[in-house]
Curated annotation (Swiss-Prot):
Protein known as: Acetyl-coenzyme A carboxylase carboxyl transferase subunit beta
Residue ranges of every copy of the CoA carboxyltransferase N-terminal domain listed in the record: 27-279
Function in brief: Component of the acetyl coenzyme A carboxylase (ACC) complex. Biotin carboxylase (BC) catalyzes the carboxylation of biotin on its carrier protein (BCCP) and then the CO(2) group is transferred by the transcarboxylase to acetyl-CoA to form malonyl-CoA.
Locations listed in the record: Cytoplasm
Database matches in Pfam families: Carboxyl_trans
Cofactor dependence: Zn(2+)
Lineage: Bacteria, Bacillati, Bacillota, Bacilli, Lactobacillales
SUPFAM superfamilies assigned to the protein according to its UniProt record, in alphabetical order: ClpP/crotonase
Record keywords, A-Z: ATP-binding, Cytoplasm, Fatty acid biosynthesis, Fatty acid metabolism, Lipid biosynthesis, Lipid metabolism, Metal-binding, Nucleotide-binding, Transferase, Zinc, Zinc-finger
Binding site for Zn(2+): 31, 34, 49, 52
Provenance organism: Leuconostoc citreum (strain KM20)
Keyword Kinase: no
EC number(s) per entry: 2.1.3.15
UniProt record similarity statement: Belongs to the AccD/PCCB family.
């Protein structure tokens, strides 16, 4: 029996201190809609859930790179005086640094599948895409340029609503942009909206719902007040998908839900069709 005694090894595996065994942030993600856990690279270039088709949120420049053949930015350097709200200047500076944008919307002239359009893309990473004075000014100028140059407007909406730090000046942008939209439409020009996740608040209450054609990405959240606010007001539980674009489609507020990878082709087809009706 002595042959089998004290044979257990007492040596220990040494850990290489130079190796970082921590899983990097963002390596695995959960789909905000269906909850599926997936490896980051499974999303692909379009950052879409392989199970349900939900499009993860994109920064404005990412979307422009995926969507357009070429893009020339407008009004990149315009600035407006910001209100003296505590901490606002610091938040603006941080948002500009994180997104490489001057405001929560990127505007310019683009070619999509060979069709020239005036393009606006809101960015939810810039202070939740909130509607500030500069945001409204840039979108207004986009419509004015499009009207003067007889171009269709394609606007991707993504917003948490009015920017509270700017008070009434933020709310005024709803009417300001709406007036520019009306002038563009009176000129017989096409305004195409693409609703993305999330589109809420004052943006939903104004120019997001004024398009001649309204497209949407799958499972995007679109509404005015948040679900919890509504439930606390009416004291009822809201139905599943109450503020999702699938419900809006069923009730006539959206014309078509389009997978992100197909948006360029669909937008180009609609623009071409509108050109034919003008002849």
């Amino acid at each position: 029996m002595d042959l089998y005694e004290n044979q257990r090894s007492t040596s220990k595996i040494k850990r290489d201190a130079s190796v970082n065994d921590r899983i990097p942030d963002g390596l695995f993600l959960a789909c905000p809609y269906c909850g599926t856990q997936m490896y980051n690279k499974q999303l692909g270039d379009y950052r879409v859930c392989a199970k349900c088709g939900y499009g993860f949120r994109l920064q404005a420049r990412e979307r422009v790179a995926l969507l357009t053949d070429n893009f020339e930015e407008m009004d990149a350097d315009i600035e407006m005086t910001t209100p003296d709200f505590p901490g606002y200047a610091e938040k603006l500076a941080r948002a500009k640094s994180q997104t490489d944008l001057g405001e929560s919307v990127l505007t310019g002239v683009a070619n999509i599948e060979g069709e020239q359009v005036a393009l606006g893309v809101m960015d939810s990473y810039f202070m939740m895409g909130s509607l500030g004075s500069m945001t409204g000014e840039k979108i207004t100028r986009l419509f004015e340029y499009a009207t003067a140059h007889q171009l269709p407007v394609v606007l991707f909406t993504a917003s948490g609503g009015a920017r509270m730090q700017e008070g009434i000046n933020s709310l005024m942008q709803m009417a300001k942009v709406s007036a520019a939209v009306a002038a563009h439409q009176e000129a017989g020009l096409l305004y195409l909206v693409v609703l993305t996740d999330p589109t809420t608040g004052g943006v939903t209450a104004s120019f997001a719902m004024q398009g001649d054609v309204t497209l949407a990405e799958p499972h995007a959240l679109v509404g005015f007040a948040g679900a919890r606010v509504i439930e606390s007001t009416i004291h009822e539980k809201l139905p599943k998908d109450f503020q999702r674009v699938e419900t809006l489609l069923e009730n006539g507020f959206v014309d078509k839900i389009v997978p992100r990878a197909e948006l360029g082709q669909i937008i180009a087809k609609i623009v071409k069709l509108h050109h034919r009706t003008e002849i």
